């Protein structure tokens, strides 16, 4: 049975939504147990009596806050995220979920759990909604500010494997984010990456930013600098559109009546753009599943992040990524 380590104190709102999300996940899935890392006195009252046999509490009080430096994470061995990562490193857990300091989670996972053989740099992946009934996996969205062509090639392989085995897509199509579809477009790094990716099965060529939300391809590859700007921009646009709609709906009785009639449409729209539906962002390229959740995650987001961790841990992703990198690297050397 899978064991999932949970950083129970790392989120912006304390342990309540994290434990609530864990409880939701445990009630819906009987095939895993959890280790909640955090202050035992705070965590124990939040756990229903009937679920105590499936939740072990690893007691610790130190929490790395969003204001702390990620480089301090290695020194603070009693912190919740350090101990959660160590559980995986020592083989006592199969995956980690944290809504805490993303930089600390990433650096600790990379240095303590270690990179998959053949991976130069891990990448953070996230799902973006599309106008179709599907999502687009985008990576990297923040792990690496600077990436070379080989890094982008590795991101593509990792993203393709994740899409195939964790998201259950048969033959994931990969696109390289650029400022035009022609192979002559892009900067020197993306042009060089295009040459490498052209030898990858399922590579569709360059894609533009708008293609992400059209569902043109299944996986979009970019460096972490561009990816993080893309992610924050998408979040901002979605939030702004929501506020504009809400503001205009209150302007007249007719618009209010129209809103009532379109309630189901608005509900479906909210589901499509709500980050809680997607859970968290997997850190691809390390030897065990690490899911980085939004600091403002509610219980639903944590529940879905745990399900992501379970899917990834059940899919043996690390060995598949290693095999694919060996196979495809032979074609580009």
UniProtKB/Swiss-Prot annotation:
Reaction(s) this enzyme catalyzes, per UniProt: a fatty acyl-[ACP] + phosphate = an acyl phosphate + holo-[ACP]
Locations listed in the record: Cytoplasm
Pathway membership, UniProt: Lipid metabolism; phospholipid metabolism
Single GO molecular function: phosphate:acyl-[acyl carrier protein] acyltransferase activity
EC number: 2.3.1.274
Pfam families: FA_synthesis (PF02504)
Record key words, sorted: Cytoplasm, Lipid biosynthesis, Lipid metabolism, Phospholipid biosynthesis, Phospholipid metabolism, Transferase
Domain of life from the UniProt record: Bacteria
An individual GO BP term: phospholipid biosynthetic process
Any one cellular-component term (Gene Ontology): cytoplasm
Predominant location: cytoplasm
Family that this chain belongs to: Belongs to the PlsX family.
Subunit and interaction comment: Homodimer. Probably interacts with PlsY.
Function of the molecule: Catalyzes the reversible formation of acyl-phosphate (acyl-PO(4)) from acyl-[acyl-carrier-protein] (acyl-ACP). This enzyme utilizes acyl-ACP as fatty acyl donor, but not acyl-CoA.
Name listed for the protein in its UniProt record: Phosphate acyltransferase
Organism: Aliarcobacter butzleri (strain RM4018) (Arcobacter butzleri)
Lineage, broadest ranks: Bacteria, Pseudomonadati, Campylobacterota, Epsilonproteobacteria, Campylobacterales
Gene designation per UniProt: plsX
